[in-house]
From Swiss-Prot:
Superkingdom of the source species: Eukaryota
Protein name per the record: Large ribosomal subunit protein uL13m
Keywords recorded for this protein, A-Z: Acetylation, Mitochondrion, Ribonucleoprotein, Ribosomal protein
Molecular functions (GO terms): mRNA binding; RNA binding; structural constituent of ribosome
Organism: Homo sapiens (Human)
Modified positions (N-acetylserine) in chain numbering: 2
Subunit structure: Component of the mitochondrial large ribosomal subunit (mt-LSU). Mature mammalian 55S mitochondrial ribosomes consist of a small (28S) and a large (39S) subunit. The 28S small subunit contains a 12S ribosomal RNA (12S mt-rRNA) and 30 different proteins. The 39S large subunit contains a 16S rRNA (16S mt-rRNA), a copy of mitochondrial valine transfer RNA (mt-tRNA(Val)), which plays an integral structural role, and 52 different proteins. Interacts with OXA1L.
Xref: SUPFAM superfamilies: Ribosomal protein L13
Cell compartments where the protein resides: Mitochondrion
Amino acid sequence: MSSFSRAPQQWATFARIWYLLDGKMQPPGKLAAMASIRLQGLHKPVYHALSDCGDHVVIMNTRHIAFSGNKWEQKVYSSHTGYPGGFRQVTAAQLHLRDPVAIVKLAIYGMLPKNLHRRTMMERLHLFPDEYIPEDILKNLVEELPQPRKIPKRLDEYTQEEIDAFPRLWTPPEDYRL
């Protein structure tokens, strides 16, 4: 095989692919796990820790993420200004109101390896609070990743046939009153 035919293959190997991930009703930890794999390039067979072969990840709807349980009030994000008395703590709900992309960004930042490549990988992360994505980013998208969790239906989204087909634990008698 000549070097002219091998060169395009090598460039295609290290080409950066743009992935889209929808964060609506998804836990930030699951989004971060999927995004960090793509940002590092762990999904590629040519991965090596010293090579920068990660892809771009675009996450939309970060305003509509979902925590399980009471984590909106119990999860605390801490920082320090470096000055005496500069320790700051803020709950997930307060941080989310201030900046809708901050929780997902911090989750992904924490899952990336703690080395000099981390800032470069974070530059390939594009977060958007709503469904609006700029045109120059939309034209680069190649693949949409599946959501990590299935979105549960609300009660008003069920059809009457699904409600009737749902198994009953107890059938009330005809003369039963609520």
